Amino acid sequence: RKPAGFCGIVGFKPTWGRISRFGVIPYASSLDHVGAFTRNVRDMAIVTEALAGRDDRDMTSSNRPVPHYLKDLNSDIKGIKIAVLKTVSDEIRNEDIKNNFAHVVNTFKQLGAIVEEVEIPNHLARAILPTYTIIADSEATSNHSCLDGIKYGDRQPGNSTDEVMINSRTD
């Protein structure tokens, strides 16, 4: 979502398993999501509805029915609870971003959503990135360990492990 925001387009991270990961080269399997970038929210609804659903080639894909994202795009949000992470929103330093964020929150309130500020204790907030890094790096290492050219592929001879990998990868 950040790359999309930096480029003035829409990015969407769907619920894990909503879109099949079949054919995707994994980074960290338990964290990987398939999403898209589009020019606007309407296009994102169309793309997500087309991609979502059960795929027998991906055992982690969801069996749940696919919502009609496009039809539901203008649905009433009255009474829906939306949490704003105060720990995160307080850290916004760019005034334009801060003002846009406040505008979105106020729009949700005007449309009848129940907006609640939620705080995550600082010690937990500080643990999020290191925890993600440990999980992602461990899974990435495991997922990509077979790509060293030693166990799988066209292994070439060498006098050391480094030389075998270099020779196998540059053949």
Give names to the regions the model predicted.
Residues 1-8:
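FAD-binding core of FAD-dependent oxidoreductases
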Residues 9-100, 151, 159-170:
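A short helix-breaking turn/cap at a secondary-structure junction
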Residues 12, 102, 107-118, 127-129, ...:
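Glycine-rich, small-residue loops and helix-cap segments
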Residues 32-35, 128, 132:
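Conserved short-loop catalytic and cofactor-binding motifs
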Residues 50, 134-135:
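Conserved catalytic core of Hanks-type protein kinase domains
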Residues 56-62, 110-122:
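Flexible, glycine/charged-enriched surface loops at secondary-structure junctions
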Residues 65-66, 123-126:
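Short acidic loop-to-helix transition motifs that present clustered carboxylates
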